[in-house]
């Protein structure tokens, strides 16, 4: 009978921390996207449940060379906190690329998505920010804000961080958390423009539906990673920022034209709908250029891709096998 491995969130937290291995597997996944006609990644399936302020995204991708591929179900029900439940959860199923049989059921409640999303921020900063970037500004005060800062420390010599959020109390609470994790200076800002001034890297991690980062605030040499715009209605960057940037890079141009910050610049008439831009995987692979000057303003528009899910699920399964983690289930 077919046997699968079942891993809980607690087990996955122990074996898949946000570390350099998570960054590398994410980087390799993006690089695979640069190989013509190799990766198979269908469009994101999205189901809206408006009566409950809910949405469900399903992502998947097949990457040649990996033994399995993941299918991720990622719900977000944003009224849940009112009844004492988390707003997001989810799970991944890893299937064999050879037989299609289920290899693992990863009951991560969104944890692996958090890790791979933060790892993507590290990959973007590694390939697009100044190599000596040391001052980071994070917009947002949730889990991803905390993880994005940790991810940046894996690839850049961060020595100072600023946190801005629309809820100042949440920003201050996050700063107190972060001070326990990092030894460098971390402060909460009550002015987003001041938070951006002098920063080398700016990461936006919010579900905003109107711009929170204004184009005129951007300074020469800065890198911006926009993480939050993974649906048509979400928008963190002033559309003019895309037009102003010296370098704009998408995780998937097909997706960012429909979901990301690029989508809003197109709708505003600032960017042609068929304008060509490099994808992050192409920059990693060296087939397209990213930053070429220290003074370049660079923007990475990350909407989240199925290759990231397959990559992190594969890493989780490998580590579970190595450490005999999880439970075996015969179907």
UniProtKB/Swiss-Prot annotation:
Which Gene Ontology cellular-component terms appear in the entry? cytoplasm
E.C. designation(s): 4.3.1.-
Q: Which InterPro entries match?
A: Ectoine_EutC, NAD(P)-bd_dom_sf, ODC_Mu_crystall, ODC_N
Domain of life of the native organism: Bacteria
Q: What transmembrane ranges does the database entry give?
A: none
Instruction: Please report which protein family the annotation says this sequence is part of.
Output: Belongs to the ornithine cyclodeaminase/mu-crystallin family.
Q: What is this protein called?
A: Uncharacterized cyclodeaminase y4tK
**Species assigned in the record:** Sinorhizobium fredii (strain NBRC 101917 / NGR234)
């Amino acid at each position: 009978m077919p046997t699968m491995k079942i891993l809980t969130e607690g087990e996955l937290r122990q074996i898949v921390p946000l570390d350099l291995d998570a960054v590398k597997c994410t980087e390799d996944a993006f690089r695979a996207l640069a190989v013509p006609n190799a990766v198979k990644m269908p469009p994101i399936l999205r189901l809206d449940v408006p009566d409950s302020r809910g949405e469900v995204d399903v992502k998947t991708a097949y990457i040649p060379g990996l033994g399995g591929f993941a299918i991720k179900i990622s719900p977000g029900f944003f009224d849940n906190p009112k009844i004492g439940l988390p707003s997001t959860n989810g799970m991944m199923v890893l299937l064999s690329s050879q037989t299609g049989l289920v290899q693992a059921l990863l009951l991560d409640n969104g944890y692996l998505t958090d890790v791979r999303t933060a790892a993507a921020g590290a990959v973007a900063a590694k390939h697009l920010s100044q190599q000596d970037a040391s001052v980071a500004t994070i917009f947002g005060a949730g889990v991803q804000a905390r993880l994005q800062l940790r991810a940046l420390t894996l690839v850049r010599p961060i020595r100072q961080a600023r946190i801005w959020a629309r809820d100042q109390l949440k920003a201050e609470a996050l700063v107190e958390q972060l001070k326990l994790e990092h030894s460098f200076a971390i402060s909460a800002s009550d002015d987003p423009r001041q938070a951006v001034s002098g920063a080398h890297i700016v990461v936006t991690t919010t579900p905003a539906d109107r711009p929170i980062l204004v184009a005129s605030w951007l300074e020469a040499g800065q890198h911006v990673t926009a993480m939050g715009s993974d649906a048509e209605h979400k928008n963190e960057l002033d559309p003019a920022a895309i037009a102003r940037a010296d370098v704009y890079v998408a995780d998937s141009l097909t997706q960012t034209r429909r979901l990301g910050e690029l989508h809003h610049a197109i709708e505003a008439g600032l960017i042609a709908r068929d304008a060509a831009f490099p994808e992050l995987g192409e920059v990693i692979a060296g087939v397209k250029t990213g930053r070429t000057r220290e003074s370049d303003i660079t923007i990475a528009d990350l909407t989240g891709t199925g290759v990231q899910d397959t990559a992190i699920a594969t890493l989780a399964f490998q580590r579970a096998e190595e450490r005999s983690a999880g439970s075996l289930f015969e179907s």
